[in-house]
Swiss-Prot record:
SUPFAM superfamilies per the UniProt record, alphabetical: Periplasmic binding protein-like II
Signal peptide interval: 1-26
PANTHER family linked: MALTOSE-BINDING PERIPLASMIC PROTEIN, MALTOSE_MALTODEXTRIN-BINDING PERIPLASMIC PROTEIN
PROSITE patterns: SBP_BACTERIAL_1
Subcellular location field: Periplasm
GO function term, MF aspect, one: carbohydrate transmembrane transporter activity
Superkingdom, taxonomy of origin: Bacteria
Swiss-Prot/TrEMBL keywords: Periplasm, Signal, Sugar transport, Transport
GO cellular component: ATP-binding cassette (ABC) transporter complex, substrate-binding subunit-containing; outer membrane-bounded periplasmic space
Single biological process term from Gene Ontology: maltose transport
Name of this chain's protein: Maltose/maltodextrin-binding periplasmic protein
Family of the protein in this entry: Belongs to the bacterial solute-binding protein 1 family.
Length: 396
């Protein structure tokens, strides 16, 4: 990744990562804004919003997209440097806030009401708001309209559909069974949850991985494997290839998968995930968020930029035109984007989902649930034993 700076183009090397406040990246200073955003996001569109801000206020805005910015930010912010504003998925922000690297943000009620309420929950840490929500990502059911014009509304219908499709040499559904991010929506549907969230805080001792609902969801998944409706070794690339070649009728994936499906010319739709036992599947929801560096001398300018320039229809449109944001937190712009049924479905699934907890204990959750699903799918452990082990690993 190359980063444009005032002194030409410097490739970030091992050396410059050691001295990150070297000329490779703009230093924090009063009277200008430096923003970091990942290279896969619409940074040129964000720079356009910055130009408008500069025209109106005279304050220069520099947008940078350093490699591994989520790792660099805590290193430089701890020394009182880095960007004024950082964009990243909300689940990393809890750790930053715990280390005192993010300023509390204080949007008034009128501004908060412009955004979907659940998106604010994603940027709350210990009861305080630590960032502004920008865009929303969640898994959806993606289906091949030529194979299933009317996709099933329930998980319980899928085995029979698979039987019908097998006669034609196809299968009903394939999705990544190796990562709990993809299997969790079914496990959580009937009452499983990661950590209990109450009063703006997560209770790390209240974990819902081996309750009756989680067991029911995982048992259904394992039964589908035992009955050969799915294969235990299916991973992301196997599932993606099968769907994009028209070999399977449905998959579970997010907005990042759409461009490859577009290229494959499959006639597809995006819709609500199926219900299980009459209850919605609960995907983890990721929220692209913008936090303000606690060391920034420009906190009021950062707030002005985020509230009155970026989080407006015009601001988000500029970023979205550069690289699609998917569903967005701002109600007025989401209403425009929702004319695309894929984006409407993403938001529907997100609103039924579970905000990805922004606490460090999630790394133990991912590891433990991944092991549990793989062990249960391969027959190494029963569902009950696998989830019991996962629960104790997460809470120990």
């Amino acid at each position: 990744m190359k980063i444009k700076t005032g002194v030409g183009i410097l490739a970030l090397s091992a050396l410059t990562t050691m001295m990150i406040s070297a000329p490779a990246l703009a230093k924090i200073e009063e009277g200008k804004l430096v923003i970091w955003i990942n290279g896969d996001k619409g940074y040129n569109g964000l720079a356009e919003v910055g130009k408008k801000f500069e025209q109106d206020t005279g304050i220069k805005v520099t947008v940078e997209h350093p490699d591994k910015l989520e790792e660099k930010f805590p290193q430089v912010a701890a020394t009182g440097d880095g960007p004024d504003i950082i964009f990243w998925a909300h689940d990393r922000f809890g750790g930053y806030a715990q280390s005192g690297l993010l300023a509390e943000v204080t949007p008034d009620k009128a501004f908060q009401d412009k955004l979907y309420p659940f998106t604010w929950d994603a940027v709350r840490y210990n009861g305080k708001l630590i960032a502004y929500p920008i865009a929303v990502e969640a898994l959806s059911l993606i289906y091949n309209k030529d194979l299933v014009p009317n996709p099933p509304k329930t998980w319980e219908e899928i085995p029979a559909l698979d039987k019908e499709l097998k006669v034609k040499g196809k299968s009903a559904i394939m999705f990544n069974l190796q990562e709990p991010y993809f299997t969790w929506p079914l496990i959580a549907a009937d009452g499983g949850y990661a950590f209990k969230f109450e009063n703006g805080k997560y209770d790390v001792k209240d974990v819902g991985v081996d309750n009756a609902g989680a067991k029911a969801g995982l048992t259904f998944l394992i039964d589908m494997i035992k009955n050969k409706n799915m294969s235990a070794d299916t991973d992301y690339s196997i599932a993606e290839a099968a769907f994009n070649k028209g070999e399977t009728a449905m998959t579970i994936n997010g907005p990042w998968a759409w461009s490859n499906i577009d290229k494959s010319k499959v006639n597809y739709g995006v819709t609500l995930l199926p219900t299980f036992k009459g209850k919605p599947s609960k995907p983890f929801v990721g929220v692209l968020s913008a936090g303000i560096n606690a060391a920034s001398p420009n906190k009021e300018l950062a707030k002005e930029f985020l509230e009155n320039y970026l989080l407006t229809d015009q601001g988000l449109e500029a970023v979205n035109k550069d690289k699609p944001l998917g569903a967005v937190a701002l109600k007025s712009f989401q209403e425009q984007l929702a004319k695309d049924p894929r984006i409407a479905a993403t938001m529907d699934n997100a609103q039924k989902g579970e905000i990805m907890p922004n606490i460090p204990q999630m790394s133990a959750f991912w590891y433990a649930v991944r092991t549990a699903v793989i062990n249960a799918a391969s027959g190494r452990q029963t569902v009950d034993a696998a989830l019991k082990d996962a629960q104790s690993r997460i809470t120990k």
